[in-house]
Structures are given as structure tokens and as C-alpha cells.
Amino acid sequence: MIGCLIGEVFALEAPTVLLNVNGVGYEIDTPLSTFCQLQKGQKVTLWTHLVIREDAQQLYGFSDAQEKTIFRTLLKVNGVGPKMALGILSTLSVELLVHTIEHDDVNTLVKVPGVGKKTAERLMIELRDRFKTLAQGTSSAAALPQIQFVSNSPVAEAEAALQSLGYKPLEAQKAVAAVKADYTESADIIRAALKSMMK
């Protein structure tokens, strides 16, 4: 099992990172909280989780061990696959997710693409006990992570990132269009667009 990879960021295309590890390029899908911290040429350590299916093997990467643990915990919930787990971690910060579960906030969870009311309620029931220990180590701040990202096309990058979460192209375009005038960085546009869609 590959527990973590240390290497240089070779290419970025939301939400996938191509990581050069001693001359071998690993394609790793990441939540936006991790993706938006990365820059081409940067040396990084990504905590990884490998999913093996009949038709493919896919690596998922995270900036820290806690986020990886949360991802694995989400996968244990009936009906939650890697794509949905990644979408949850991309839309909600670890702190907000823990806060949401602690306070039975179904309305926040259903704003994540692909999460309906039944899935949200199942997440609440199955994660409540598992998240009690996490709640002690995190604040309940309802903010998305502070992220920095360098891109030649901030608007296009933001739209692509939102679509990778499961938002429809028109939804992503509208959300980005509503906030793009106020920001110049992709990460800021993504964060503001996500916040606007969570209202």
C-alpha cells in the first residue's frame, strides 16, 4: 500500500495532480483544499489512499494525515464512494464538516453536489460517533480553508474545479461570474463561489 508520496508537482489540472517521484509520474486526485495549495515545481508530501477497482487503480492525495483519515472514514459510510468523499472534502473544510456533523446540519450537507437528503442523514448517523474524537482537535469555524493558487486563467481554473466537484457547467459559470470581479486569484474565486452556493 502506498501511504504517502514525496515528489515534485509536474502538472496540475483540477482536481488531478501529476507528481514526479524519482522520475515516475503519479496521477493523484485531490480535494480542492489540497489542490489549491500546490504550484508547479513545488516539492510536496501527499498522504495517499489507493482505490483498486476491476477496471482501474486510482490514487487520492491529501495535504495532511487528518484529511486522509476523514476521507477513509467517509468511504465507510454506505453509499459514499471516492468521488462523493472528495466532493465533500472539497466543498466543506474539515472544521466545517465536523461542525456540521456535531450539529446535525443536514441543510449544509445537501449543498454538496451528489449528496441528497437521505445520504446526508445517513452521514449524520454513521459519522456522529466517529467524529467525536476529531471534534476535540478541530475548531468549529465555518470557514473554507485558506488556500493559495497560481494560475494563468483564474476564471477557467475556478470553473473547472467546481465542475470536478459535480456542479453542472452552467452552475459553475454562474457562481464564478457572480464573484470573479472581486478576486484575481483562482483560489479566492473558488472559495467565494463555493460560499455563495452554500447559502
From Swiss-Prot:
Compartment(s) where it occurs, according to its Swiss-Prot or TrEMBL record: Cytoplasm
Keywords: Cytoplasm, DNA damage, DNA recombination, DNA repair, DNA-binding
Keyword Zinc-finger: no
Record-linked Pfam families: HHH_5, RuvA_C, RuvA_N
Residue numbers spanned by region Domain I: 1-63
Domain III, as annotated region: 150-199
GO cellular component: cytoplasm; Holliday junction helicase complex; Holliday junction resolvase complex
MF terms in GO: ATP binding; four-way junction DNA binding; four-way junction helicase activity
Domain II: annotated span: 64-142
Any one GO biological process: DNA recombination
Annotated stretches, region: Flexible linker: 143-150
Major subcellular site: cytoplasm
Notes on the domains: Has three domains with a flexible linker between the domains II and III and assumes an 'L' shape. Domain III is highly mobile and contacts RuvB.
Function in brief: The RuvA-RuvB-RuvC complex processes Holliday junction (HJ) DNA during genetic recombination and DNA repair, while the RuvA-RuvB complex plays an important role in the rescue of blocked DNA replication forks via replication fork reversal (RFR). RuvA specifically binds to HJ cruciform DNA, conferring on it an open structure. The RuvB hexamer acts as an ATP-dependent pump, pulling dsDNA into and through the RuvAB complex. HJ branch migration allows RuvC to scan DNA until it finds its consensus sequence, where it cleaves and resolves the cruciform DNA.
Family: Belongs to the RuvA family.
Oligomer status and interactors: Homotetramer. Forms an RuvA(8)-RuvB(12)-Holliday junction (HJ) complex. HJ DNA is sandwiched between 2 RuvA tetramers; dsDNA enters through RuvA and exits via RuvB. An RuvB hexamer assembles on each DNA strand where it exits the tetramer. Each RuvB hexamer is contacted by two RuvA subunits (via domain III) on 2 adjacent RuvB subunits; this complex drives branch migration. In the full resolvosome a probable DNA-RuvA(4)-RuvB(12)-RuvC(2) complex forms which resolves the HJ.
Protein name, entry field: Holliday junction branch migration complex subunit RuvA
Gene that encodes the chain: ruvA
